[in-house]
């Protein structure tokens, strides 16, 4: 084997090692960004709680009592109260708008036959249909001084419309939308009957529902009442249809989940 001087192989690349080693051994500090580094997000050092309080919250409301007593072939109109603008930690809102997440409700109705036998004893037998319907009012406004909410027959055509799936009348379709309807038939030979009802409605998807409020600074009204709602109030109608003279008493609990 021959020993002697090493002869490198020919290569098309330049033999200048300085170009190959350029950049090697250079200090990492030379690549550091010059000047101060700004934070990724602005920080309020003086405690603005508005953004922090805009979180998921829950509001409960019970509807019952003499105002919710319904006679046969009649209805009761109401609405779901929205949160009040306060600095409380729960059941409130921090701005003049909220985003509705879902509304669930559970309740009980007690129906009694009002007719009497010839001997003065209560007449037996109850037959009818109870309906609870939730309606979205896109632009709330008081209907009249005596009846603030739009009447059920005017909105749906007649009170007997609750025998089927409810549909808004043409003149009001741009303003109102049915968002939930539950119906329970009653058919018993007894003189009284009690049943439970429930339902839920989730909001979201491509078209979420944002409820905004007037919050007039002059009058100091920052409530969740229908009169203070600027857009997207939720109306409720209870209907009891029966050919038997009867009276319905009810209790209903609403749970509204929202961001606000």
Curated annotation (Swiss-Prot):
It is found in: Host nucleus; Host cytoplasm; Host cell membrane. It is a peripheral membrane protein. A motif (Bipartite nuclear localization signal) lies at residues 21-42. InterPro entries: Gemini_BR1 (IPR001530), GV_A/BR1_coat (IPR000263), Viral_coat (IPR029053). Residues 1-29 are annotated as: Disordered. Belongs to the begomovirus nuclear shuttle protein family. Binds to the genomic viral ssDNA, shuttles it into and out of the cell nucleus. Begomoviruses use 2 proteins to transport their DNA from cell to cell. The nuclear shuttle protein (NSP) shuttles it between nucleus and cytoplasm and the movement protein (MP) probably transports the DNA-NSP complex to the cell periphery and facilitates movement across the cell wall. Binds to single-stranded and double-stranded viral DNA. Interacts with the host nuclear shuttle interacting (NSI) protein. This interaction may allow NSP to recruit NSI monomers to the viral genome and thus regulate nuclear export of viral genome by NSP. This is Nuclear shuttle protein. The lineage of its organism: Viruses, Monodnaviria, Shotokuvirae, Cressdnaviricota, Repensiviricetes.
